[in-house]
């Protein structure tokens, strides 16, 4: 079979053959037209099929791209949230790490509010857990470092200060008359005579004795 060098040469050859066939065989031109029409339909169907295939391929690629972007954004949000959580927990460690300083301040002062702050911080430290293994190690070290540092002495001094505070509050309530105490009248001195009253009675007694002596001498 001969091959044509180009489409134009092929078209020219087909046109020449068609003319010869028209002259030699009547009706051949109609058959050629049908063949051409059929070929055109086949070509159009192929073009449509190719277009549909391209669209489907584009749609699949677009879905893959959207899925990738969604997963990537989700991963970024998780990393950002994890970073914020880590930062927050590190800040919390920094806040709780000053418990030792507060304990020293508490030993040097009798501030009940400071004791309450220390108690809250220790409670928060004891109840703190995390899924981060590195942070968990730091937290455990912080617990041991703070809770095992002269805690017995700290508790003893705190108990002593609590007793002093309770005693001072009790005395204040007695002086106000809010609490009755054996031997005491609310708001007054103990039952009996005060030192001033004793002195006054002694002075009065001395006066009576002197008057009796003067009466005796006058008689």
From Swiss-Prot:
Subcellular location: Nucleus, Nucleolus
UniProt-annotated stretches for the region Disordered: 153-219
Key word Zinc present: no
Any GO CC annotation of this UniProt entry: nucleolus
Sequence ranges of Basic and acidic residues compositional bias: 153-176
Keywords: Nucleus, Transcription, Transcription regulation
Predominant localisation class: nucleus
The keyword Ribonucleoprotein appears for this protein: no
Acidic residues: compositionally biased ranges: 194-219
Job of this protein: Involved in ribosome biogenesis, probably through modulation of rDNA transcription.
Similarity comment: family membership: Belongs to the RRT14 family.
Protein name, as recorded: Regulator of rDNA transcription 14
Lineage: Eukaryota, Fungi, Dikarya, Ascomycota, Saccharomycotina
